[in-house]
Amino acid sequence: MATITKPEIISEILELLQPKIEEEKQVIVHCCFPAPHFEGNLIRIWSSTFLIDNILGHRSSLIHHENISLFPYWTEVPPFKDFWFTLVFTCLPKDCESFDLKEEIPQEGGFIVKNIKRNSTDIYRVKIT
């Protein structure tokens, strides 16, 4: 039986064969809408909701929402119970230290939470008022 030698594979081919892992960074914001004291309260979020870096003005876009309807639909908020929903945004710049959560809408009543301090996990809990 003939000896089989190990084939040489050029480095460019090896690189192409390696799995491509691209780290996707996202910012998760858990929002609390305080308990209303009456029935019939409605809530929704617009796609024009951003995280805005307080220094650079960079805008991170809303990419996902949980437990809240997206405009033009509404979500009913139960009375006497805090209502929680989650928003997921594209990443913030590395050097961002604080940011605002702002819903930019063509009417009154858009959400705004100012000066949220950046943390290492990029997971936040805020109160919407």
Predicted feature locations:
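Solvent-exposed, conformationally flexible loop/turn segments
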Residues: E24, P78-F80, N119-T121
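Acidic/polar low-complexity flexible segments
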Residues: G110-T129
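Short, solvent-exposed, Trp/other aromatic-anchored flexible loops in extracytoplasmic proteins
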Residues: H64-P106
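Short, well-ordered beta-strand segments enriched in hydrophobic/aromatic residues
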Residues: K25-P36
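The feature marks short-to-medium sequence segments in extracytoplasmic or secretory-pathway proteins
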Residues: P36, N41-W74, P78, I128
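Short edge-strand/loop segments of extracellular domains
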Residues: T49-I55, E103-G110
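Low-complexity, acidic Ser/Thr/Pro/Gly-rich terminal tails and inter-domain linkers that flank the onset
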Residues: M1-E24, I55-I68
